[in-house]
Amino acid sequence: MVYISNGQVLDSRNQSPWRVSFLTDFFWGIAEFVVFFFKTLLQQDVKKRRGYGSSSDSRYDDGRGPPGNPPRRMGRISHLRGPSPPPMAGGUGR
């Protein structure tokens, strides 16, 4: 890419892609990515502390917690069954 610096037209192809400033910027970019990645893994409540939580998060602030699971039904639900599957193919080959 061509650019102008101090009144001179310069071409970026003349610069090495492995110059020191590029390598240090690349290193710090990778380091920041790793730090932020592990911060998000270890701090799951970061949304609540920064005010991004939804209003539904405040429903259980009285200490009761969310309601438990509904009671388990005994037996099978037969009225929602569809047609029975077709018989298995194969046989004894005679």
From Swiss-Prot:
One of its GO terms (molecular function) is identical protein binding. The chain crosses the membrane at residues 20-42. It comes from the Eukaryota. One of its GO terms (biological process) is T cell proliferation. Residues 46-94 are annotated as: Disordered. High expression in spleen and intestine (at protein level). Expressed in a range of immune cells including T and B-cells and also in myeloid cells including macrophages, neutrophils and dendritic cells (at protein level). It is found in: Endoplasmic reticulum membrane; Cell membrane. Keywords: Calcium, Calcium transport, Cell membrane, Endoplasmic reticulum, Ion transport, Membrane, Selenocysteine, Transmembrane, Transmembrane helix, Transport, Ubl conjugation. Induction: By increased dietary selenium. Expression is significantly decreased by a low selenium diet. It is a single-pass membrane protein. The keyword Kinase does not apply. Disruption phenotype: Normal growth, fertility and immune system development. Reduced receptor-mediated Ca(2+) flux in T-cells, neutrophils and macrophages. Reduced T-cell proliferation and reduced T-cell and neutrophil migration. Decreased viral clearance and increased mortality following infection with West Nile virus. Bone marrow-derived macrophages from knockout mice display decreased uptake of acetylated or oxidized low-density lipoprotein, reduced foam cell formation and decreased palmitoylation and cell surface expression of CD36. Cleaved by CAPN2/m-calpain in resting macrophages but not in activated macrophages. Macrophage activation up-regulates expression of the calpain inhibitor CAST/calpastatin, resulting in inhibition of CAPN2 activity. Truncated SELENOK proteins produced by failed UGA/Sec decoding are ubiquitinated by the CRL2(KLHDC2) complex, which recognizes the diglycine (Gly-Gly) at the C-terminus of truncated SELENOK proteins. Belongs to the selenoprotein K family. Interacts with DERL1, DERL2, DERL3 and SELENOS. The SELENOK-SELENOS complex interacts with VCP. Interacts with ZDHHC6. PANTHER family: SELENOPROTEIN K. Required for Ca(2+) flux in immune cells and plays a role in T-cell proliferation and in T-cell and neutrophil migration. Involved in endoplasmic reticulum-associated degradation (ERAD) of soluble glycosylated proteins. Required for palmitoylation and cell surface expression of CD36 and involved in macrophage uptake of low-density lipoprotein and in foam cell formation. Together with ZDHHC6, required for palmitoylation of ITPR1 in immune cells, leading to regulate ITPR1 stability and function. Plays a role in protection of cells from ER stress-induced apoptosis. This is Selenoprotein K. It comes from Mus musculus. The gene is Selenok.
